[in-house]
């Protein structure tokens, strides 16, 4: 398949959106709990996408208290979040109605889907059942919200199962990573980098989708940021 043209994308999870910094971007991914609206008059040509965690839920989210304990598969100790069992039959509808629908009502039409592989944090899990559950989640979103645009953060194995339902695939830490446990920026090992490059090439060449790479650099390290 021919590779689609890649839009310019920025990710910003801060509370104060510096509009002038984002005029060069087609898409800005933001934390919707920090932003009152899905559009900014100062940026008429920029689309705002909402960051949404799929398999992990923080206790601070409004819908957290309504998630049954039986749906909780594991805990991410680094971020203090609960990992949700994607094989639960009622989860796709819950995710669509409780997580995405309120954001859709606020005007968001694009979503950055994070934590698509966090089920692997569990001690035991059925890989196929978890992936099938995630496919049902994505299909539920397209059925419930016609025209929805989705950027995957990883989820490489899911993309071939969802033709026409993914707009772009992102991946963190091609060259540099952030270690939440040690609170340090680290260089990615060459073996991991080559594996990730292979995944991204497949997405571009096999699926014809644009890719987005997110690397982590200390804010004061301007030279490395520009490298």
Whereabouts are the PLM-identified features?
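Glycan-processing catalytic domains of CAZymes
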Residues: 2-227
